[in-house]
Amino acid sequence: MPQTRDPTLDTLLDLDGQALVVDPAGRHWVRFVVTRVPVTPDKPHGLDYSLTLHGPDGERLAGFDNAHPVARQKRGEPQDHRHRLRTVKAYDYQDAATLLGDFWATVDALLRERGIIP
């Protein structure tokens, strides 16, 4: 049976190269790097992606990506994962819409915790 194309993938791909300010003071921003790549064991979804939230000094506060191995992994091969401050955890990629929803939920939570947004 042929694999069904993710109908939300174009939305994610359209964000490639975008940087958006996400707080009223203009001090926090998000960046999207999303490209199609051949399907490989390292990139089983055919995507190379990095969705990141940055603070006033440019430091990464949160991110979702699949560009490098997760430190605690047994064999160290790359996999989907998320960063939140200094914590890195595996991320179970489902589809583009879920990735975007999870990313924006993390952004909102961090900005609320820091008192940036109500």
Residue positions per predicted region:
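Short, surface-exposed secondary-structure junctions/capping segments
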Residues: L47-Y49, R75-Q94
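Well-ordered alpha/beta subsegment
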Residues: L85-I116
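Acidic side chains
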Residues: D65-H68, D80, D102, D108
